[in-house]
């Protein structure tokens, strides 16, 4: 009788033990390890680009949020994460006019559940730290994307460091067989390189400080693994050099990077000796990346998951880079076209309409025409900012009237001098290629300003010596001189009956014509009869009338594009960056919104004077062709370079005279030879 309880106990223990053994259905089938992957679709540095476009002839385009929806939906399994690595809300006017809110709304709602997270880029702080920190809530209908910056501390609010997501996975051994369910937990941590914080306007980040980004990432990665039980750690970071940054990381599997505007897919050994997969997807929504991070789930041969292990092989990750061409290919499927149309019509169009309404708002009025071409439409294209704006308007003029270049440079000087707590600019420059329109007398709208400065370039201040600044201006005048040669030839060709486009095709602008500089903060006297290096006769600052000192260091306001052109302007390599001020277009908008802004430009930008009332002697030009008549054949003018200038060969008189002289000499020589033989 006493044995029965013992047998019952043994039976109970045996039955209990069975709960830890795979069911008979899995006997021999459940693998010891299951292979899987975490997929991350990612963008970076879109700079306010938002709408799909594709130029088949050039093979280039923009993916945009509508194109991104097509790529997202085309995956056999929806990506586990949609992440962004910064410089997202600032750049194109579509973004800046709403202070980034339009982009934030699209990130939240464009398709599916929208983005999971982003991290700030250096340009994203242009609206202020508080607006950036709360940007994620704009337009959100459910859970908004996360704004992650683990190394930012603010007195006005808390910055999020990371998010986690548990991925439910299922393994199945063929059709009709039982399934095995397990989970993978992923942590995403974000940060911005602390060195980028030093270039931000102090007023925009007041109350915010930045600690070491790599240290902050490592600490959060450790917490996510130990306290949150994360199996995979993904880092999104806006950093000066992604590979250098990755080498400092500990416990991170993947770095999705931004800032360098490059396509990157490499393994870097982290500070813990383990591989970190580093990816970056270009810029301006030209590319979108899809990263697959492989893992091995160790089942230990049982259905229980309490002690299962996950091994991540980050070094074996696979990166796929998509372009607008891939979207174009997918649009051959009507289902994909429907997705694109749905996003464009229901998500993008309402924001486009709001943007158009804002663009039509009048900012101020102008009493003067500030054209960038010979008329408001810019006939010939940029000819004024490349040539005539730097020359006397007509014989007898000694001072140039205000130009569109002066207006732009005046706006830079105005904005950088508006905050007494920051270093104001002494000088300003803008390159011709960055000026895409002019201002006509009358009302000036926000759209007019966007047309002038459409690229979303950033206004920055840099320090450089007076000598380096003068060297740049001198070389700019040399480029302008070559542009003037082309322009004179174009004018003659048009006068002969050709179209403006034919003239430009025949006599092309120099390749570096977009580098001609407009300048402000300085009164300059130019002598066009001199050679490069000697044309600037005098240069005095508008702020105090002092002569520009070659040995002194000055603060120069410029767009972020031209200052990096050390090919045309080698002395720019010596410049040191100080501060970022927002978009160039925003500076111009702020100026024109002020009362009596034209008077302010006149006092800030300065003047261009000429040491002689006459322009330099004109360079040789081709003899203009007669206007073509029906049925006649026109012979193309041929030109050649002579001593660096275009010389005309349309007049053949010198050639004929020379040929006669040579022929006469030959006859005389032959006569002498014949006489001697006799």
Predicted regions and their residues:
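Bacterial N-terminal signal peptides that target proteins for export
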Residues: 1-8
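Bacterial N-terminal signal peptides
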Residues: 10-20
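Sec-dependent signal peptide cleavage junction
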Residues: 18-34, 647-655, 674
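Acidic, metal/ion-coordinating pockets
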Residues: 28-323, 404-407, 411, 428, ...
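Feature captures C-terminal
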Residues: 34-39, 49-53, 58-63, 143-151, ...
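A short C-terminal boundary segment appended to hydrolase-like catalytic domains
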Residues: 179-183, 295-443, 592-616
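C-terminal low-complexity, Ser/Thr- and acidic/Pro-rich disordered "stalk" regions positioned immediately N-terminal
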Residues: 612-651
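C-terminal membrane-anchoring or membrane-association module
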Residues: 659-678
């Amino acid at each position: 009788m006493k044995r029965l309880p013992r047998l019952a106990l043994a039976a109970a223990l045996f039955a209990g033990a069975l709960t830890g053994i795979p069911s008979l259905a899995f006997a021999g089938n459940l693998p010891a390890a299951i292979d899987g992957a975490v997929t991350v679709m990612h963008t970076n540095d879109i700079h306010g680009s938002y709408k799909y476009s594709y130029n088949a002839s050039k093979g280039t385009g923009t993916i945009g949020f509508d194109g991104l929806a097509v790529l997202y939906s085309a995956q056999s399994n929806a990506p586990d994460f949609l992440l962004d690595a910064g410089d997202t809300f600032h750049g194109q006017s579509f973004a800046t006019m709403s202070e980034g809110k339009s982009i934030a709304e699209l990130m939240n709602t464009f398709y599916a559940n929208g983005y999971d997270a982003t991290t700030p880029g250096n340009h994203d702080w242009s609206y202020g730290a508080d607006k950036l920190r709360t940007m994620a809530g704009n337009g959100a209908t459910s859970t908004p994307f996360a704004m992650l910056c683990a190394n930012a501390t603010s007195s006005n609010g808390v910055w999020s460091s990371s998010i986690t997501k548990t991925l439910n996975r299922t393994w199945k051994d063929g059709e009709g067989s039982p399934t095995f369910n397990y989970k993978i937990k992923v942590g995403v941590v974000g940060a911005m390189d602390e060195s980028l914080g030093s270039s931000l306007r102090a007023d925009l980040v007041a109350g915010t400080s930045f600690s070491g980004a790599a240290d902050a990432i490592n600490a959060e990665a450790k917490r996510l693994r130990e306290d949150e039980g994360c199996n995979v750690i993904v880092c999104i970071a806006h950093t000066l050099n992604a590979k250098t940054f990755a080498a400092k990381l500990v416990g991170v599997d993947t770095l999705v990077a931004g800032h360098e505007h490059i396509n990157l897919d490499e393994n870097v050994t982290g500070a813990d000796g383990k591989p970190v997969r580093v990816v970056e997807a270009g810029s301006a929504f030209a590319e979108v990346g899809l990263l697959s991070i492989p893992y091995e789930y160790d089942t230990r041969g049982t259905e229980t998951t309490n002690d299962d292990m996950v091994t991540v092989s980050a070094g074996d990750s696979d990166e796929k880079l998509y372009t607008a061409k891939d979207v174009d290919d997918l649009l051959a499927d009507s289902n994909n076209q429907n997705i694109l149309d749905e996003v464009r019509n229901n998500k993008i169009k309402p924001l486009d309409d709001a943007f158009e309404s804002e663009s039509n708002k009048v900012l101020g009025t102008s009493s003067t025409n500030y054209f960038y071409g010979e008329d408001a439409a810019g006939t010939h294209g940029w000819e004024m900012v490349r040539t005539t704006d730097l020359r006397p308007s007509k014989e007898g003029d000694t001072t140039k009237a205000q130009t569109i270049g002066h207006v732009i440079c005046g706006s830079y000087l105005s904005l950088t001098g508006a905050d007494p707590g920051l270093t104001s600019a002494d000088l300003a420059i803008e390159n011709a290629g960055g000026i895409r329109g002019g201002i006509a007398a009358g009302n000036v709208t926000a759209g007019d300003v966007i047309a002038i400065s459409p690229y979303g370039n950033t206004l920055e201040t840099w320090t450089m010596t007076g000598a380096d600044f003068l060297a740049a201006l001198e070389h700019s005048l040399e480029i302008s001189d070559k542009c003037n040669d082309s322009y004179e030839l174009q004018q003659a060709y048009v006068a002969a009956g050709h179209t403006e486009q034919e003239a430009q095709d025949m006599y092309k602008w120099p390749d570096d014509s977009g580098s001609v500089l407009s300048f402000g903060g300085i009164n300059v006297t130019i002598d066009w009869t001199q050679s490069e290096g000697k044309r600037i006769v005098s240069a005095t600052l508008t702020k105090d009338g002092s002569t520009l000192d070659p040995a002194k260091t000055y603060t120069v306001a410029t767009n972020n594009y031209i200052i990096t052109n050390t090919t045309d302007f080698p002395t720019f390599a010596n410049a040191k960056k100080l501060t970022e001020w927002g978009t160039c277009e925003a500076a111009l908008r702020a100026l024109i919104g002020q009362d009596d802004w034209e008077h302010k430009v006149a006092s800030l930008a300065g003047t261009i004077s000429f040491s002689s009332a006459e322009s330099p002697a004109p360079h040789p030009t081709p003899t203009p062709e007669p206007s073509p008549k029906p049925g006649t054949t026109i012979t193309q003018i041929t030109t050649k370079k002579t001593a660096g200038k275009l010389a005309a060969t349309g007049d053949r008189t010198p050639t004929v005279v020379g040929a006669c002289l040579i022929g006469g000499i030959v006859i005389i020589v032959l006569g002498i030879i014949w006489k001697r033989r006799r």
